[in-house]
């Protein structure tokens, strides 16, 4: 597992500034679980970092991103319907950049459908590609061609991605990504990948920053938080992590989701 830190992309920021007469606006809509909501907050943070403002209506935007969910077929159909509804807007605003990311973008048949049937979709990238968004936008602005990445899972965790949190009271804090359980009914391991745990020091630093910023309810996120720590060099499990976070002074509540009962230990229960 490789751990890297997000870096500001000066080239992308300069290209964004040059491409628009007025400061550009981005509309980001996230579907699905809390992990997707948190990913959406980080996507917004990355966009602001390279010069975009944020807006609440797609018709006001210079860039539209749908951060998608693949757990239910109905959610996928909603996304395709919403993407299809943008065709007319794209015709009115040829410079509009339309993108799709998230779990749906980690499925080959979805990427191929977008490639063949939605020629006005400009950007496609998966759940592991948030940190590459500035590079993809720069490529689109430079070459004026579609940038549709084939599904791929990166054995990497990127720290310090900028974030624009939606609440000043509640905060999401990912501690791990992916799942190794491969339940018959669930697509998560195939689109989110195998389990990857963040280093405890990085989690603690982000947690302390949230407490110091005044957040009162902090929810630890993972597809299976009970299996936190597997694969780390440091011997630590989820109960150890909870004890570590509770050493931070302050007035706050810790919540977590989601968990698998087979990984719930007596140590955690105690």
Q: Would you name each region that the model predicts?
A:
Residues 1-228:
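Proteins enriched for Cys/Gly/acidic motifs involved in redox and nucleic-acid/cofactor modification
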Residues 98-100, 107-109, 212-270:
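Conserved SAM/AdoMet-binding glycine-rich loop
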